[in-house]
């Protein structure tokens, strides 16, 4: 959003849709989608790209919500940031299930899915004694995830995000 704000004067109007995980309701919908798409008796590890910024907290929140909804054998890990491979490895060991399915938590299952998930993470888990399957289907291939993005785009078309400082200025001026 900050990058686009610099370009705003050059356009009549710019709208930016929200990311997949923005509201608590978004997280709940994604938990419902993941649990419906990847149900089973084995552990499932969704691997996101991650980041070293505070935005990485969204992965931990999603992991927490999966567990809170009763999906204790579904885990979220990240290539960069938290939850790290080491964090997820401890959780997988506590599942007492030696079969794991790796799934990219990425819109497109591209280079990271092949190089990091299907190669590095799979190999590291196999060295720890796990039998590992991979499902390299990107989130963008799931119709219910597509619907969430469409919902966010429609919302952005109909409602303009108001910056908090602009909102506070308006409130201050109304009080005068």
Language-model features and meaning:
Residues 1-176:
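Extended amphipathic ligand-handling, pore-lining, and cofactor/metal-binding catalytic surfaces
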């Amino acid at each position: 959003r900050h990058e686009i704000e610099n370009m705003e004067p050059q356009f009549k109007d710019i709208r930016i849709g929200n990311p997949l995980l923005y509201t608590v309701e978004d997280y709940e919908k994604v938990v419902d989608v993941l649990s419906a798409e990847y149900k089973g008796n084995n552990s499932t590890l969704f691997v996101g790209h991650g980041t070293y910024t505070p935005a990485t907290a969204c992965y931990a929140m999603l992991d927490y919500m999966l567990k809170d909804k009763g999906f204790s054998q579904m885990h979220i890990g990240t290539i960069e940031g938290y939850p790290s491979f080491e964090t997820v490895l401890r959780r997988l060991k506590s599942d007492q299930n030696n079969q794991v399915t790796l799934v990219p938590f990425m819109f497109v299952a591209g280079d990271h899915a092949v190089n990091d998930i299907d190669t590095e993470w799979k190999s590291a888990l196999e060295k720890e004694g796990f039998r590992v399957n991979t499902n390299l289907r990107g989130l963008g291939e799931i119709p219910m995830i597509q619907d969430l993005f469409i919902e966010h785009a429609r919302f952005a078309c109909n409602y303009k995000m108001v910056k908090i400082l602009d909102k506070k200025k308006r409130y201050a001026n109304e009080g005068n």
